[in-house]
Amino acid sequence: MFSINFLGLLPEAYAPFDPIVDVLPIIPLLFLLLAFVWQSSVRFR
């Protein structure tokens, strides 16, 4: 019972972090782009 009530409160508790959660899926793509930039810089050096 406690876990169900606790999960019910989570969305309200984490409401200020909604913009951060919206950005989180983009972070792996940034690392992928960083890998390409790093490889190109190493290749041309």
Swiss-Prot record:
Top-level taxon in the UniProt lineage: Eukaryota
Entry annotated with the keyword Chloroplast: yes
GO CC list: chloroplast thylakoid membrane; photosystem II reaction center
Organism: Euglena viridis (Cercaria viridis)
Protein name in UniProt: Photosystem II reaction center protein K
UniProt propeptide residues: 1-8
Location(s) in or outside the cell: Plastid, Chloroplast thylakoid membrane
UniProt-listed InterPro entries: PSII_PsbK, PSII_PsbK_sf
Task of the protein: One of the components of the core complex of photosystem II (PSII). PSII is a light-driven water:plastoquinone oxidoreductase that uses light energy to abstract electrons from H(2)O, generating O(2) and a proton gradient subsequently used for ATP formation. It consists of a core antenna complex that captures photons, and an electron transfer chain that converts photonic excitation into a charge separation.
Subunit: PSII is composed of 1 copy each of membrane proteins PsbA, PsbB, PsbC, PsbD, PsbE, PsbF, PsbH, PsbI, PsbJ, PsbK, PsbL, PsbM, PsbT, PsbY, PsbZ, Psb30/Ycf12, at least 3 peripheral proteins of the oxygen-evolving complex and a large number of cofactors. It forms dimeric complexes.
PANTHER family membership: PHOTOSYSTEM II REACTION CENTER PROTEIN K (PTHR35325:SF1), PTHR35325
TM annotation in the entry: 17-37
Membrane-protein topology: Single-pass membrane protein
